[in-house]
Amino acid sequence: MSENLWKKALELFAGGVNSPVRAAVKPYPFYVEKSEGAFLYTIDGQRLIDYVLGYGPLILGHAHPYVKKKIIEQIEKGWLYGTPSKKEIELAEKIRSHIPSAEKIRFVNSGTEATMLAIRLARGYTKREKILKFDGNYHGAHDYALINAGSAVSEFNVIISSGIPTSIINTVIVCKYNDLDCVEKHLRTEEIAGVIVEPVMGNMGVILPEQDFLNGLRELTKTYNSVLIFDEVITGFRLGLSGAQGYFKVIPDLTTLGKIIGGGLPIGAVTGKKEIMSNLTPEGKVFNAGTFNANPLTMAAGIATIEVLETTNAYDIANKASKEIAEELDNSLSKKNFKYTINRIQSMFQFFIGISKVTNADDARLANKDLYVKIHEKLLKLGVFIPPSQFETIFTSSSHSDEIVNLTIEAIHKVVSEI
């Protein structure tokens, strides 16, 4: 059945999909009928253990009963008002209570919108035009982000997307991740409005900051009066309730959030210092608006998700699953005659074959992508779904029980022994 739908999709959608990475599953994407817990159920009758989890939002797994209950309760009250609602206050209070940089908040509808607005805010606040980003960091699908980006941009060998004016390209400076010398060189010009960074890279596989990198960014941006923006769309509420900034104890000026704070529904947010956030309309002159901003349905899902994270051992379960799977993958790969490395933090990890250390995007691009795809395809046949792209992240959730983890480990041992 998936094959028939794929043929229709090719007639209806550009490239057959509505987000490029979905086309990376070969020979055609499988189509999902329903999801629950750690499982996807395809229209072809296959049950898959899911380690993609919507590319990050579903830290509690699919269709969590409490989140579902709160979504249904809100649907019965209406799902779009066009006015403020109590729910936006409740979710904002939860975010502010946990995220150290979140003095004020503006909700939007995606991570892309959030980073686009954060960049605009940095430029409006500093009256400078240039932005510094890092090679392989993915900040969504807008013009200022699609320059040396990660994720599907790298998968399809696109360094700079077509359609971006040269005038915009010239305002974006790119440094290697973990390279503070490059950052200081460009900040010294005092032309940089802001530095935007994934504190943990999640769209070139998983790449961790070296020991002094984030602290170095904090000190340099203070010295040269640039805005430090942490893109925590992935790491926010995944590395813990306080995100990467709490985990690494480095507080940025602005933070972008998304994914988990919407409980699986579309969301984004910009949070940060009052003096910067006050530049947003209607208080200031940096414009932002949105029909669906802070819609009550997404707010309800986000509140429910954070409530579960606050009151249960969800993080412990998700982190344990990630640790055990990564360790057993390491055991299997160590028996093979090739170099490899596994980068992991909390409930997110990725493995790279053919290279022994990955600290930036250039390293990640040297990995054996063909062998990664073979492992993905063999695991899929055994009912385990990891990302089809080397440049995505393997996520775990609180729905990945010991039994599910053990089934996954069995599949990994079998697949790795055969490659």
Swiss-Prot record:
One of its GO terms (biological process) is protoporphyrinogen IX biosynthetic process. The keyword Cytoplasm applies. Keywords: Cytoplasm, Isomerase, Porphyrin biosynthesis, Pyridoxal phosphate. Its EC number is 5.4.3.8. Pathway: Porphyrin-containing compound metabolism; protoporphyrin-IX biosynthesis; 5-aminolevulinate from L-glutamyl-tRNA(Glu): step 2/2. The keyword Repeat does not apply. It is found in: Cytoplasm. GO terms for cellular component: cytoplasm. GO terms for molecular function: glutamate-1-semialdehyde 2,1-aminomutase activity; pyridoxal phosphate binding; transaminase activity. Its main location: cytoplasm. The modification N6-(pyridoxal phosphate)lysine is found at K259. It is an enzyme of class 5 (isomerase). Its cofactor is pyridoxal 5'-phosphate. InterPro entries: 4pyrrol_synth_GluAld_NH2Trfase (IPR004639), Aminotrans_3 (IPR005814), Aminotrans_3_PPA_site (IPR049704), PyrdxlP-dep_Trfase (IPR015424), PyrdxlP-dep_Trfase_major (IPR015421), PyrdxlP-dep_Trfase_small (IPR015422). It catalyses: (S)-4-amino-5-oxopentanoate = 5-aminolevulinate. Gene3D superfamilies: Aspartate Aminotransferase, domain 1 (3.90.1150.10), Type I PLP-dependent aspartate aminotransferase-like (Major domain) (3.40.640.10). Belongs to the class-III pyridoxal-phosphate-dependent aminotransferase family. HemL subfamily. This is Glutamate-1-semialdehyde 2,1-aminomutase. It comes from Sulfurisphaera tokodaii (strain DSM 16993 / JCM 10545 / NBRC 100140 / 7).
